[in-house]
Amino acid sequence: MAKRKANHVIPGMNAAKAQGMGAGYNEKFSNEPLTEAQRQNNKKRKKNQ
């Protein structure tokens, strides 16, 4: 039998989707004002949502 890949992780898409939006980055900074560097970094996330 062929080994099957997990269907919920689609290559080419954001792999973190499998863990839900609460995993990592978003949760960490959600209640603090962003520094300038983080704000620059955040533009990419906003576009994806």
Curated annotation (Swiss-Prot):
Keywords: Sporulation. The keyword Secreted does not apply. It comes from Geobacillus thermodenitrificans (strain NG80-2). This is Small, acid-soluble spore protein O. Induction: Expressed only in the forespore compartment of sporulating cells. Residues 23-49 are annotated as: Disordered. It is found in: Spore core. GO terms for cellular component: endospore-forming forespore. One of its GO terms (biological process) is sporulation resulting in formation of a cellular spore. Belongs to the SspO family. The gene is sspO. It comes from the Bacteria.
